[in-house]
Amino acid sequence: MDLLKRHLAPIVPDAWSAIDEEAKEIFQGHLAGRKLVDFRGPFGWEYAAVNTGELRPIDDTPEDVDMKLRQVQPLAEVRVPFTLDVTELDSVARGATNPDLDDVARAAERMVEAEDSAIFHGWAQAGIKGIVDSTPHEALAVASVSDFPRAVLSAADTLRKAGVTGPYALVLGPKAYDDLFAATQDGYPVAKQVQRLVVDGPLVRANALAGALVMSMRGGDYELTVGQDLSIGYAFHDRSKVELFVAESFTFRVLEPGAAVHLRYA
């Protein structure tokens, strides 16, 4: 059976299209991590784990028998529930073009936060180590927005000295992003100065990131594996409400910890 169970929902096709489009706009506009790392998938619901290629010794074995256990990294299945009004959805079939889908947007934003937070800061209970916590490079303090050009240049230099080639992206948490794009120095936007002088990749806003990151986009350093990609499914309904959910299954692996430098920015 299809785990999304959309065919059981009391929702007309046009309303489903409106729901999907609302969520799609959030995903396309807010997802940051998957734009910066290698993406594998989607492989579907049945894909359960990533083969790491590693072995773990087993101590308690028969005499003269060497046994090892293959290691895998399981995918986490994530759901964010939300509720919509049945009458509101039925109005779409009558020609309404602006149904109230705010709860769809909020659920999609929560899913974006879950995925990006796992990528940047890890998710210990799911066996995921994030980019920030994995890097061996010392974090660089950015005391003020005017220090960003120096800090980003220093971070890129650290990566080059470690043999990590570019292009390099600058990933900014919400405060760092807003402050950087609002700042000027001698009448010139600091963000343009950063991009022109010290970053040959994109400047990306990541709402789930604390501070900022300078990271390589050469590929092969970070890997997001997706089973079921971002989808909307049906849970249950009564006469007035229908409960839906945003769902995804994924895991994230850091293959080269030294491919990023964290910038601390209060």
From Swiss-Prot:
Keywords: Encapsulin nanocompartment, Ion transport, Iron, Iron storage, Iron transport, Transport. NCBIfam families: encap_f1 (NF041155). Belongs to the encapsulin family. Family 1 subfamily. It is found in: Encapsulin nanocompartment. One of its GO terms (cellular component) is encapsulin nanocompartment. GO terms for biological process: intracellular iron ion homeostasis; iron ion transport. It holds the Pfam family Linocin_M18. It comes from Haliangium ochraceum (strain DSM 14365 / JCM 11303 / SMP-2). Shell component of a type 1 encapsulin nanocompartment. Assembles into proteinaceous shells about 21 nm in diameter. Small pores form at, or close to, the 2-, 3-, and 5-fold symmetry axes. Data analysis suggests the 5-fold pores open and close with maximal and minimal aperatures of 15 and 5 Angstroms. Cargo protein Fer (ferritin-like protein, probably stores iron) is targeted to the interior via its C-terminal extension; empty intact shells can be isolated in the absence of cargo protein. This encapsulin nanocompartment is formed by 60 subunits; monomers form 12 pentamers which assemble to form shells. Shells are loaded with 4 encapsulated ferritin-like protein decamers (EncFtn) in a tetrahedral arrangement. A 3 nm gap is consistently seen between the shell and the cargo. This is Type 1 encapsulin shell protein. The lineage of its organism: Bacteria, Pseudomonadati, Myxococcota, Polyangia, Haliangiales.
